[in-house]
Amino acid sequence: AEIGKTAEGRVMLMAIITSPENHKKLARYKEISRRLALADGVADDQARSMAREGKAVVWIDGGLHATEVLGAQQLMEMVYRMVSMDDPETLRILNDDILLAACANPDGMDLVANWYMREPEPPKRSTAGLPRLYQKYIGHDNNRDFYASNQPETEAINRIFYHEWFPQIVYNHHQTGPAGTVLFAPPFRDPFNYYFDPLVPMGIDLVSAAMHNRFLAEGKPGATMRSGSGYSTWWNGGLRTTVYFHNMIGLLTESIGNPTPVRIPFVPQNQLPRIDLPAPIAPQEWHFRQSIEYSVTANRAVLDVASKYREEFLFNIYRMGRNSIERGSRDHWTIHPKVIAAVQEAVAKERASGGEERGAAGGGGRGGAFRFGAAPAKYYEMMRDPANRDPRGFIIPADQPDFLTATKFVNALIKTGITIHQATRSFQVGGKSYPTGSYVVKTAQAFRPHVLDMFEPQDHPDDVPYPGGPPRPPYDSAGYTLAFQMGLKFDRVLDGFDGPFEKISGFAKAPAGKVSVSLSPAGFL
C-alpha cells in the first residue's frame, strides 16, 4: 500500500503481511486496534472481547538512516520469507499477527545504493563520503523528527502509527553494533521516562527476552543489552521512542555488517560473559549475509512473541490508554528526581537535628523510621503537594503574539494523534478570561504521556555511579519539549475545567492575516 510521498517525490510503500483470511477482514482488525489504543468509551469487558478477536499489529522498518544499509536489505529478505514460507511457525504468525513492513527512507536508499555501486570493483566499494544528506532536508536527524512531523516521510509514518493502524509493537532497525559484539538489542538502560506507563518498559522486557532467547537457541552469539551500550527510553522524538509516549512497545537494534566484509575486533572485556552479554563472540571476519540472518532472527522473535501473547498486547495497550484517561481526569502526581531530592533534604535535616535519636514518627526504638533507609511517613505528603499536581489540561490563548506558530504546534500534536479542542467563544477558567479561538489540550486522553512531554519541563535524573563519580550523559537530548522550543504562550490548568470547546477535525487553521496600508509609508518590505 502507498502511505505517502518522500521529500524527493518517491512513493513510500508499506507491505501488509498476514493470512489470506485476515486480509478479508483488515478493516475490522484496524478498527479493533484503533479502539483499543484510544480506549475512550471502551469498558474492560469490551476490551477483553476485542483483544480476543483482534490481531497483533507489528511494525518493522528499515533504512531510516540510509548509510546503515543492513536495515533496508534485511527488510526485503524478511518480506520475501514471510510471503513464501509455509512452516507451522510462519503460518501461526500469519494467522495471529498483521505485519506492517516499510522502508522508512526510500530517497536515501536509492542515493546510497547508487553511491556504493559507482565503484566497479566490489572490494573497493564503500558508502563513505556520501555527497549530500540522505534525507533531503535533515539527513540523520530524520530520527529526531517524530514529535514534530516536519518531513513528509515522518508525517506518513506517524499517520500509520497514530491515526490508522496503532501498532502494539514498533521495531526500528539501525546500525552499528558495539565493538566486539554483533548487535545491541533491548532491554535498555535506565532511566525510562516518568511520563509513560510502566507497562511500556515491562512490555519491552518481555519482547526483548524473546529476542535474546532466540539468538541463543539458534546458536547466534554476540548480542548485548542494557549496559552494553548507551541507549535508553527517556527521549521523545525518535521513530521508536515517540511510540513509548503512545503506549506502544518500541524496539531498536544496532547491528554490525556491511556489503563489504568487516571484522569483529578483539575487545578483551567483551569475551567475559555477563548478564548483559551472555554469549560473547570470537573475533572474526563478518559477512553481510550473517547480519541479515541475525536481523531475520530478531524479526521472527518479535513476531513469534506477538503471536503467543496476542491478547495480552492488545489488552495492555487499552489498559495503558485507560490509565492515561483516568490519570488525566483526577489529581495525579508524576514523581520526578527533584521531588525525591527535596524529601531527602528534609529527612537529612531532621536526622541532623536529632530526630533519629527520638525515633521520629516511626517508633521502633533507636533510629525508628530512619532504619534501613526508610523515612517518616509524614514526608510522603511532600510528594502530594497540590501545587505539584500534573495539569488537567493546557490552554493556548488566541491573543498571543505569534498565534501562527501556536497553530503549527497544535498541528504537530494532531499529527501525533493528540485530540485538540478550540474555543467557539470567549470563556473563563480559574478566573482568567480567554478569547475565542484559543486552543485547549486536555490530558484525559490515551496519549496523555505525549501531551505532558510536549508541555512540561524535563527533569532527567543525575546518572552518577557513585558520589563524585563520572556522570553518564543521557543518550540523546534530555528534553524534546516542543512548546518551549516554539516559544509558545500557554497556561497549565491543575483543576478540571470545561467550556465552549469544539474538537478540531483535521488540522487547525490559523486566522487570516491583515495587510495594513499607510497613507505615507516610510518604505516597503
Language model: regions and residue ranges:
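Intrinsic-disorder/low-complexity accessory segments
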Residues: 1-97, 138-139, 144-145, 150-152, ...
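Short, solvent-exposed turn/loop segments enriched in Gly/Ser/Thr/Pro and often Arg
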Residues: 6, 101-106, 116, 172-180
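Divalent-metal coordination cores built from histidine and acidic residues
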Residues: 89, 94-144
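Proline-aspartate-enriched helix->loop->beta-strand connector
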Residues: 161-176
